[in-house]
Amino acid sequence: SYDLFPNKTVLGNITLAPTLVQKRDKAEVEKEAIALLERVGLADRKDAWPHELSGGQRQRVAICRALILHPEVLLFDEVTAALDPEMVREVLDVMLELADSGQTMLIVTHEMQFARAIADQVIMLEDGGIVEQSDDAEAFFTNPKTGRAKRFLHTFECDRHRRPAETP
């Protein structure tokens, strides 16, 4: 359900917290919510109910609901875990756009190709402890320091999947 309120439309889910908690003007919040929905490709679903949406659409609504609060950092915990492959791409595309726009995100993921494409810093955790930490994400993926990280990354063949170089 992505913790969407089943008795509220997409627009109602996004506008609830800013109007109720932050006491922001409803008309301004709705305008911003629609702009966020346009940003994630869901403006045409603003009047839909959560049960009418796919998993990927619900996840994108949840992202809009977080963004409308103007957070300094967005937290994502296995954001694609329950999604089918088509929906995974939709959500990852939104997250990539957020990163490109400068949004700071803390992402827990097993999507190693995506992590490599988007990360500035990487912390690999296992059993609640830090296996390896790198302030240089590319160095982590190309030359991990620990044997455990090397074995893990080899499983995903991360060295074969790189983000295309940007052209000047």
Locate each region found by the language model.
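C-terminal boundary and immediately downstream tail of ABC-type ATPase nucleotide-binding domains
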Residues: 138-168
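Catalytic Walker B motif of ABC-type/P-loop ATPase nucleotide-binding domains
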Residues: 74-77
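H-loop/switch region of ABC-family ATPase nucleotide-binding domains
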Residues: 109-110
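Helical segment within the ABC ATPase nucleotide-binding domain
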Residues: 88-101
